[in-house]
Amino acid sequence: MHSWKKKLVVSQLALACTLAITSQANATTYDTWTYYDNPTTALDWNNMDAAGTVDGNYVNYSGFVYYNNANGDFDQTFNGDTVNGTISTYYLNHDYNDATSNELNISNSVIHGSITSMLPIGYYDRFDTLDHDGYSEYYRFNNGTDTVDGNWYDGDVFTLNIANSTIDDDYEAFYFTDSYKDGDVTKYTNETFDVSEGVAVNLDVESNINISNNSRVAGIALSQGNTYNNTYTTESHNWDNNINVFDSTVTSGSDYILDSAYTTDTGTFGTGHFGNSDEPSDYTGAGDVALSFTDDNGASDYAMKNNVYFSNSTLMGDVKFTSNWNANFDADGDDTNGDGVPDTNHGWADDGLNVDELNLTLDNGSKWVGQATYTVDTTSRMYDVETNSLTPGATLEDNAWNRIVGNEVFQSGVFNVTLNNGSEWDTVGDSTVDTLAVNNGSQVNVSNSDLTSDTIDLTNGSSLNIGEGGYVDTDHLTIDSYSTVGLTESTGWSTYSNLYANTITVTNGGVLDVNVGQFDTEVFSTDKLELTSGNTADHNGNVVSGVFNIHSSDYVLNADLVNDRTWDTTQANYGYGTIAMNSDGHLTINGNGDINNGDELDNSSVDNVVAATGNYKVRIDNATGAGSVADYKGNELIYVNDVNTDATFSAANKADLGAYTYQAKQEGNTVVLEQMELTDYANMALSIPSANTNIWNLEQDTVGTRLTNARHGLADNGGAWVSYFGGNFNGDNGTINYDQDVNGIMVGVDTKVDGNNAKWIVGAAAGFAKGDLSDRTGQVDQDSQSAYIYSSARFANNIFVDGNLSYSHFNNDLSANMSDGTYVDGNTSSDAWGFGLKLGYDLKLGDAGYVTPYGSVSGLFQSGDDYQLSNDMKVDGQSYDSMRYELGVDAGYTFTYSEDQALTPYFKLAYVYDDSNNDADVNGDSIDNGVEGSAVRVGLGTQFSFTKNFSAYTDANYLGGGDVDQDWSANVGVKYTW
């Protein structure tokens, strides 16, 4: 029986095992409990007949395991068998012979019932419902012989191997019918003999239990049994238990009969649902035990060491640990020298030998759902032993003052839990352990339950998730190496903090994630939040810091914010902690007060208490296209409620907020948002009108080249022409910045008209171009279509006037990435009207050369539509006007090879002034996106006439010095003259 089901009275009945069980060589079904019925007399439970009695009425047990099975029960191997009832290894375990194997192997079998190392027991009045005498009535069974040796031998460990088998604790009672004569009438009584053990495996011997290959065991209880050995004197020993579970499941068992509804007459606790009764393995919540470890042997001098390992397995149920002082340990202390002051706790010199242990490890994706509980003896009167645990309460002075002096204690037992490699623990009820280590992507989920541990350590991407109704208490919480502790609105805190720790350390990429509402202070409580980073030497010179993330919370930290890091990169302790938040978040750091319960509001020069110390980066996590400058610029992010703070804060990143990027900036004991440059998407949106103008300017140059070439070389009577144009631009007006590539084609047709005072060329052209606009992550794909009418008048005195009118339509598809990685896109279109006018004089140099001074003016007037990007940035439709003024000179020479062939190279030099003073309205703010300034144009070109009617031409230009530099442009075309 478990320690939680105390026996009140013991009645022994030695029964001979008279029913022989056949060989276990073949798969067989066995029943360990049977009933011998005398049909003439009724069963008298209080005076049950002895086994083998002629004409008796008795329950018979045949389930003992022996090393050398000569008694007709079981040997040490079950393979493919089914057993109904209780298997007892009592005689196997107590045969202390070095030559015998203390091992039981169960494979490919089903045990409907339990295994025990004790003598089997059965209750006929477990709940005292028959005679109400205050006792539970039961019988204990043996084989009528004594054990070989009553001593305990340390190291003679019982090994139980369970492979591909089920032990379901589902034989909780032996049901039988007793018949008897009442006169000449045969009557029947239905009897229940309660043989439930509470779990499937119940052992009070040192044990190694190996469970593997998809096995299922409904609970294990290990207790420290007899440790007496008359040959042991002063040497130390340990009682060692090991449980290893691979690819299998351990569930809770059952203390009571479940296959009938509860009645006060029988004391059964089963329930029914659609015709099915509860099963022992049905975990119903806190109190339903799957693993139990009990050292309540008050006569033992030896500690009980329990190691439990689960790999790729499931544990469904509570884990219970009970520990008491060894018999040779004095918790109050002993005065050995008679001076009236205790000086020793006795026990073993090695403190570890005085302490029971339960070490539970979940590995390789194992999962545990259940409660961890322990009952241990504690003392704070430590004379020659060292602290091995902390109390969630307090230790007091051992005097009349009775003041709180700490939390350190010495316990009779410690319970440690470790999760490795993606394992999981979902806590239930009120769990208490000494240490909790969560490693390598594992997780602990605490909802509608409590978890208390002296220390909690999370490493390598692990997580502690505190959900609704979850509470976690610890002395020291360490969040290390990209692990996370999460607290959200759904946590549901009220009067008490859902997370309490005297110290919280966040480092090496760990995250304390607090995503709550406004003006919150109670979601977690701590005296000290250590937000720091690992040594750069351990991270190849990089800083990997811990993160305190408050999202959009308006959070008040009533704790000291500390680290020992400096901003000085030359120092060995260079590093920082990171405070992360959204732009609408706010952190107030109040500190936790000084030793006299003062606070950091004392700003005098003698105040030695600071609310924050160390070096920190402030990271803005959110990004949005919405909001004006007034919504962000100068907003307070952090307020340290202590002007004497020596903490340093600097920007960890830039965040895209509205049209601009912002970063954190320290101003005294506050940190505010500092406005920086345009965001990538805003930069692209504001650069589009200028980029449209660049395309149009290239088209202007293309039309101008056509008209210039008509005045030089062989005679030109008008014709048809086609020209490629392209170029690269770099724009920078101090606000916008971009790089642009353009490629396009123009086709035109014109004719020569002789006027009274001038010779005219009149024509029309169409242009098609694509542009690629970019800067950092910003990208714009441009399409334009243009229509031109143009003319040129050349007078007899060699003065000429060129002019054109144009209509253009521009389509622009914008995309970019925001600072948080979010993809942004949008599109806009605009219509534009333009003109060009050029006045010049062709000065002839002999028959073939010329120099042409000229002046020109051109203008483009765009009208765009209102549009909004996918991140909610709004751009009002902009009327964007651009004027260009140019003074220059062309010079060339025509080499004539025949009357049909000629080559005319030429050179161009000009001064250009762009006047484009424009502002755009973005999110309600006016932003300068005009480009202007003086520039110099340098160009080279040539025209070659292959025949009288067919010629080709090319030129290249550079223009630089203004807000927009044209790194290069090219114009390559052919024409056919009439």
Swiss-Prot record:
<keyword id="KW-0732">Signal</keyword>
<dbReference type="InterPro" id="IPR012332">
    <property type="entry name" value="Autotransporter_pectin_lyase_C"/>
</dbReference>
<dbReference type="InterPro" id="IPR011050">
    <property type="entry name" value="Pectin_lyase_fold/virulence"/>
</dbReference>
<protein>
    <recommendedName>
        <fullName>Uncharacterized protein YaiT</fullName>
    </recommendedName>
</protein>
<dbReference type="InterPro" id="IPR006315">
    <property type="entry name" value="OM_autotransptr_brl_dom"/>
</dbReference>
<dbReference type="InterPro" id="IPR003991">
    <property type="entry name" value="Pertactin_virulence_factor"/>
</dbReference>
<dbReference type="InterPro" id="IPR051551">
    <property type="entry name" value="Autotransporter_adhesion"/>
</dbReference>
<dbReference type="GO" id="GO:0019867">
    <property type="term" value="C:outer membrane"/>
</dbReference>
<feature type="signal peptide">
    <location>
        <begin position="1"/>
        <end position="27"/>
    </location>
</feature>
<dbReference type="InterPro" id="IPR036709">
    <property type="entry name" value="Autotransporte_beta_dom_sf"/>
</dbReference>
<dbReference type="InterPro" id="IPR005546">
    <property type="entry name" value="Autotransporte_beta"/>
</dbReference>
<dbReference type="Pfam" id="PF03797">
    <property type="entry name" value="Autotransporter"/>
</dbReference>
<feature type="domain" description="Autotransporter">
    <location>
        <begin position="713"/>
        <end position="978"/>
    </location>
</feature>
